[in-house]
Regions:
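Mature, Sec-exported extracytoplasmic domains of Gram-positive
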Residues: 9-10, 24-30, 124, 147-148, ...
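Active-site SXXK
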Residues: 11-35, 50, 184
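Penicillin-recognizing serine hydrolase domain
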Residues: 64-218
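A mature extracytoplasmic/lumenal domain signature
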Residues: 8-10, 16-18, 54, 66, ...
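Short, hydrophobic alpha-helix immediately C-terminal to the catalytic nucleophile
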Residues: 23-27, 60, 104
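Conserved catalytic neighborhood of penicillin-recognizing serine enzymes
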Residues: 31-82, 99-100
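Short, conserved catalytic-motif segment at the N-terminal edge
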Residues: 1-11
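Secreted/periplasmic proteins that engage bacterial cell-wall peptidoglycan
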Residues: 1-2, 16, 101
Length: 218
């Protein structure tokens, strides 16, 4: 399909948008170690909390269990995400670096299945979690809501108190139904979380309406 981007190569920190990749590296470890698939019970519970509720403690536990930076960077390499990597100065998932186009590629591989980095069962499991994000975190790609539309998504937000005090506010996901089937990624920095959320909602709403209107069809 067609790809439209504005500043798609711009790099910033992932914040909680990294959590789908954290669950991915945990699933890869479980498979490599021949453990329960797609995840052992304890890690499955952590994955559910990390994705559906954006629970940071659960993401921390999965990050530690799955192998931290080396495992994350190996997944990014296997997915062909050339501008996605851990932060050399901070061994913390929130500070991993990525770009909108890399996240678009990740979502494309996750949804369409054209990757060997994750099995079909792993992809299905992760998309299932991303389709159950709690309501108050379905802004951005998931705005507006509709009972006839399915959204698999994850948002991320963090304030850079040690640098410029701006907020990184990100949203990635897949929207299908009601005549639509598209992937959308948004990354930006804003003076406040509310400003970033409102901007992502505006883009999510605009893309949803435009792609249902036929205006961009060739």
């Amino acid at each position: 399909g067609a790809v439209w981007d504005f500043g798609g190569g711009w790099a910033s920190q992932s914040a909680s948008m990294a959590k789908p990749m954290i669950v991915s590296i945990a699933m890869r470890k479980a498979r490599a170690d021949k453990l329960q698939q797609p995840l052992p019970a304890e890690q499955a519970g952590q994955a559910e909390k990390a994705i559906e509720h954006s629970d940071n403690d659960s993401a921390d536990a999965l990050w530690d269990w799955a192998g931290r930076r080396p495992a994350y960077d190996a997944l990014a390499s296997d997915l062909g995400l050339k501008d996605t990597h851990s932060a050399p100065e901070k061994d913390f998932w929130s500070w991993t670096w990525t770009t909108p186009l890399d996240q678009l590629s990740f979502m494309h591989q996750l949804v369409r299945g054209d990757t060997t980095a994750l099995t079909d069962a792993q992809r299905s499991y992760l998309l299932g979690l991303m389709g159950q994000v709690q309501d108050d975190q379905t802004w951005g790609v998931g705005f507006p809501k509709s009972g006839t539309v399915q959204v698999e998504m994850k948002n991320g937000w963090v304030q850079f108190q040690s640098t410029d005090n701006l907020w990184a506010v990100n949203s990635i996901g897949h929207v299908s139904g009601d005549g639509r089937d598209y992937l959308l990624t948004m990354m930006g920095r804003y003076p406040s979380f509310d400003a970033g959320k409102a901007y992502c909602n505006a883009i999510g709403d605009w893309v949803f309406r435009i792609l249902g209107s036929g205006e961009l069809q060739k």
